[in-house]
């Protein structure tokens, strides 16, 4: 298997603590539907020495979560060293998005400009809250101030997303 280009990868999950004695691990999925993570392959794990393949041999629902066994993890001793390892896939293996739909990874790094043409910062991450996703916007060199912001990812807040220009326009005052 050829090594992936790190720039073409997208994080889709993370390995958590071991489950049982046979090397199974809890899997935290960042996909919209939790179990959809298993429909993508190949998986890559990010290590200190670069990206290495991670092959799922079997998986199942366990309580409110999911657990999986991997070819590279033969027993619990190895599994204990895997807690926190991130799971990545090649972006090219993802289906195309519809108009006005975006993968969160495409939004990270965009400049956030309000309707008053003030730069509020850069999108650092998005996370789900239950009601709607939230963008964590951190100060950038061009920001109007040094304040981090939490801005809802919602059609009433986000007016324009221009991936080619690397920016989005939001209806969000600087002092919210």
Swiss-Prot record:
Localization (cell): Cytoplasm
Q: Which residues cross the membrane?
A: none
One Gene Ontology cellular component term attached to this UniProt record is: cytoplasm
Q: Keywords for this entry?
A: Chaperone, Cytoplasm, Ribosome biogenesis, rRNA processing
> Could you tell me the superkingdom of the organism this chain comes from?
Bacteria
Alphabetically, the GO molecular function entries are: ribosome binding
The record's subunit annotation is: Binds ribosomal protein uS19.
Q: What is this protein called?
A: Ribosome maturation factor RimM
